[in-house]
From Swiss-Prot:
The lineage of its organism: Eukaryota, Metazoa, Chordata, Craniata, Vertebrata. This is Zinc finger protein 518B. It comes from Homo sapiens. Belongs to the krueppel C2H2-type zinc-finger protein family. A zinc finger (C2H2-type) spans 162-184, 190-213, 1036-1058. The keyword Metal-binding applies. The keyword Magnesium does not apply. Its main location: nucleus. It is found in: Nucleus.
Amino acid sequence: MKDIGQQLYTTHLNGGHNSLTMSPKQPDANGAPRPNRQEAQTLLYQGSEAEAAMMTIATCAKCKSVHKISLQDLQKGTGKDGMYVCFQCSLGAAPPNFHFVSNNSSATHVGNKTENFSSSVNSKFKVRNFKPGKYYCDKCRFSTKDPLQYKKHTLQHEEIKFICSHCSYISYTKGEFQRHLVKHTGIFPYQCEYCDYGAIRNDYIVKHTKRVHERAGAKRPVKAVAKLEPKRTGTSKQNPELLKASNPRTTFQNKWSDQLSGFSLHANKDKMHNIMLLPEPKEYQKDVVCIPNKMTLSEPNEVNLFENKNVEVEVLSPAKEPVQPGMPLTVVAPAELVVPANCLAQLIDVKVVNGTQQLVLKLFPLEENNCLEAGRDNGGNSERMVKEKGSNEQEKVLSAEKTKSLTVDGNVGKLVGIDSFQPSVQKQLKNVKWVRSYDFIMPNSSVHNNGKSFINSETIEDFQKKNNLYPHRTAFPSVALKGHSLASVFKNSVLRSLGAASNPFPYKAAVCFAESGRNLHSSSQQLLPFAASPATCSFSGEKGLLPVSENDLESTSKVNIPVKVVSSNRKQEDNQTEEHKAVSTVGQISSQHKSEYLHINITGEDRSQQPGDKPLELKNSERTNNTNDGPVISSVFSLSSGSENVPEGIKWNSSTSKIKSIELLRRKIAQLIESCGKPSSLASNSAHRRSVGQASKGTSKATSEGIQEINVSLTGLGHSTGTLQKPPNDGGITGNRQLTHQQIYPHFADGSNRKTKSRVARKAHVATPVLIPKGAVLRVLNSSENAHIIEATCEAPVSIPCSERQLIKPVPFCPVRQADSDLQPLRSERGPIDMSPNIETPLRPKLRKESAVCSTIHRKTGLLYGQQGSSELNKQGRLLSRSLSISRNKTKQVHLSRKKNKIQAEPSRCLKDPSIFQVARQLRLIAAKPDQLIKCPRRNQPVIVLNHPDVDSPEVTNVMKVINKYKGNVLKVVLSERTRCQLGIRRHHVRLTYQNAEEASQIKRQMMLKMKLKKVHKNNYQVVDSLPDDSSQCVFKCWFCGRLYEDQEEWMSHGQRHLIEATRDWDVLSSKGK
């Protein structure tokens, strides 16, 4: 029958006669397979041309059966509409259902008689919606009305065939051939990366992923397993037994967490490495490769440090069946069990020793793109070997009790005690370079529902011993964290953030420090710059050690806080003489994530930061559990161009923090405003910002040489940051994180001036008179009343982002000596406050340099007694001014100050009512939908500024009025500098203002249009419509989205856009209907 069918179709093609309807696709029941090689076209029909000219194929219009008939019979058998009707249907009897499908596969044609041709075609190619007049291919789903196209298509099938090598089945399409091969091999050509689902087409995998593995529109696997799929050919050739479990994954589960924390264990053919455990949440961490300079452990005593070790684990899955080789395991393991994130662990064998199950695991490093290029020293030529024992295979033995409590035995790379590292080990470890670094960030705010810390603080204190910890040359970055609410500890110097399952992790996490022989005081703070690559890290805790990198990759979407690490290329000869010592400022800042993160200011190792770097900020976020209150804004645009200005989301999230003293805060802000316009206070402010951080034992008697040394280094540095060496005896850092004046200056002069004198000529144009050291303490003396220091009562201390284009990099030194018990600095426990100048774009571009002066004005502190301290302050200010090389900056500073004073004068009048300071809200934008796109507006695109109800305050009203005065030069709309200074608003992320008690009751005015701007230039906006004067006028509500407008025209134009969008395709529909 197959030959007959081919003859019939070929007859039609060669005969050139077009039948009225071709047969529907009904491929062979006998099923011809197909191979993956091309063959020459074969002419299967060997009849005469005369017969081909006389015979053709026709399809019955009623029963859809295919018949081979002559042209004469075709002309006779056509019905009323020119359709061919077969003999049985023409009799008027009820046609049988598909009577052409005959069980007899040997139907033949004798002579010129026409018989029912049962095209034994595969049922998968049956045409569901058969339409007369179309040609249907019986080998695939192709159909066309053009007979020439149909002829070309059928010829392609004769040329391209796929023959199965197992059974000689002939297929004509690749998809059918792959479907057939699954019967023989059992392996699908496409695999789901999150589960064992396989398919013959990739679009099936895409649909499966969307249907099964996506939650709330965000693509993430059900199990947070970072899957690194190995090459299937490599594993099957090297280890045939691995095919028993093609997707082995072992997840170490935390039974206190809601989700599994995935550690992918995959197979490969490469040789074995013994690398520390790197937990890898898929969405937030990147692969890390440690590349030593081809050094191995050579001495016998070094090898003894890394010994086999039994680790007891609890098997969770499989629970009801015995553990067998090749099956996936889910175990709860302590921190001692280390499996690299870029390695695969395959269960090879199960042994029983003394009634205990021992599972033999085989480790394979993956061959995929985990091996990045080595650092500058290696040039990408070094091998991926970390503490390798020299054997091609290393085995880990999991031994379990009869109660499913397993232990792991193997070359785990155990570090036998924190103080057991000998200098020989350190010499080997110091050459390890990091070519890539993790992003440690808590994945989602919704995960931190318990509000607890990862690891108990008791566990942390066990590892924070006052021993010689070596945090500098370990194979992994080390972090020591301490604090009552501390959450994060590095297991083997890697934060065990457990991916999405970031609930408290009760197991022990040994913090292994292996470098730099430096004493770690439990209450003192030290910073580790070690050889790390660009990283943006966020850690839990208030104090600690952080890696430092050459570049500051500030991610605006996921990474909360940029932690920049300064890495060095030069080798350290001696552990005790390293200059990776810096003094950092620690502050608690309300960050945008609902877990606690750590930001540290670091300078290190006589290495200036790159021009693009920013000083680091140490921040500690507040935990907020209420993420749903506040209106949802469907479209919010940033009012300045650039990728860093893209808003995080479009939903306001408010976390309320009470201010202890409303009146004192109001007076403090008023004093800051008053001092903005005094030119004489500018120099004293700059000098005082330095002297505050250096004041010791109740006086601020900084010598002129010291001040000049600082100013020279700061002025010459430009964007670079000088290093601050630490005395060898660690005397500079005390329990309260205070530095004496005598310890700072000599090392400061040595550490920074020698590196920056060469930069003075190139970077001099960057320096400005606004020199504010990173971390200077804000102390405002309420001069009208008693002389006690006002404590910063807001939970978020002052932290102002810095703009490198307008301001030079200040050196982050600043811990201040607490001398008088009556003077309350800002939370000694939290450390001094970050006071880097905030250069946001004010109303005129030239005013950008002045904004920091108006925002962070330091009044004389209680450390300076009366007029004597004030005069000393002025002396220091004069010395500071002399040290600045560019004299014209001073006159420009005074000129800009007067302009700024005029602009700030009007907003300052709105601070009479203390009720507006009752509640400070932290406003953050969150996307209402996971797939919502937020982007900056394009040029000439009208921008509508929508404000949260809490922003509807006299403060914002006056700011808008001031902006309206400068219609041609609006760079962006922000709150006033003093508000950002006092409440620590992070640029581009948080909107923070005061809520008036009266406006809080007006809930119906949740979404109020404040101003409409038009983008007239790349960085400029023009005010199209100003603020309505009468706030009590009628409010119009949008019918579509519920947005409220005070202006009727705006409300109408807004609704018109909705109407246009809703009826965009109506004209197409109406034309089709006609």
